[in-house]
Amino acid sequence: MKFSFFTLFPSLISGYFEDSILKRARDEGRIEIEWVNFREFSQDRFKKVDEYQIGGGAGLVIEPRVVTQAISELKAKNQDAKILFLLPAGKPFTHQDACRLAQKESHLVLVCGRYEGIDERAIEANADEVFCMGDYILTGGEIAALALCDAVSRQIPGVLGNEESLQGESFDSFLLEAPVFARSKTPEGLSAPSEYSKGNHAKICALKRRLSLAKTQYYRPDLYKKYKIQESDKGKK
């Protein structure tokens, strides 16, 4: 899988892949990372890429020409590249999206917004999908793009050292993962559930299921509602 980050600040991207799992995945050739600076496509002598808004308003906007030209040059090399914009106005990115992109795509282009945003004409002309990472505003799309890249990458075979790590994770089937406990000395007054250490795997699985349901219902009632609908649909088949 190849990831191309279109950004005004490449240094925000490069450091993320210098440690841990994604560094190993990159070294092993399971993922390929590149970053493209929009300023390279500016015809302004000072490499300016932003402009004031039509109709007024606070903040500068990244002009459409530099975005479209950057994407056009990449698409000329790979027509199959999927163009994703990371913007507050996008649809919520989910675990299901991460799995889908990992399974179906080979090259993701992650366009990172900045300032007051990207000219809407560039989005309409180039975006295959527009994603948002949550109901909050970041200073730029780079953090969101890295989060998307991380979520997709770990679904690629071989990226995680233990493939079992993907099983039963939070958001699988709209449920949060059950609590986990380290095999270390118990802090005073903070014992783990006794069933976890008794070796009866059937009972452990049943307990984890109950705890997963309770955790989801408490922390994420929105997900729990989706889970209940999913289970209801299964019963109708």
UniProtKB/Swiss-Prot annotation:
The keyword Methyltransferase applies. It catalyses: guanosine(37) in tRNA + S-adenosyl-L-methionine = N(1)-methylguanosine(37) in tRNA + S-adenosyl-L-homocysteine + H(+). It comes from the Bacteria. Keywords: Cytoplasm, Methyltransferase, S-adenosyl-L-methionine, Transferase, tRNA processing. Specifically methylates guanosine-37 in various tRNAs. Homodimer. Belongs to the RNA methyltransferase TrmD family. This is tRNA (guanine-N(1)-)-methyltransferase. It comes from Wolinella succinogenes (strain ATCC 29543 / DSM 1740 / CCUG 13145 / JCM 31913 / LMG 7466 / NCTC 11488 / FDC 602W) (Vibrio succinogenes). The lineage of its organism: Bacteria, Pseudomonadati, Campylobacterota, Epsilonproteobacteria, Campylobacterales. The gene is trmD.
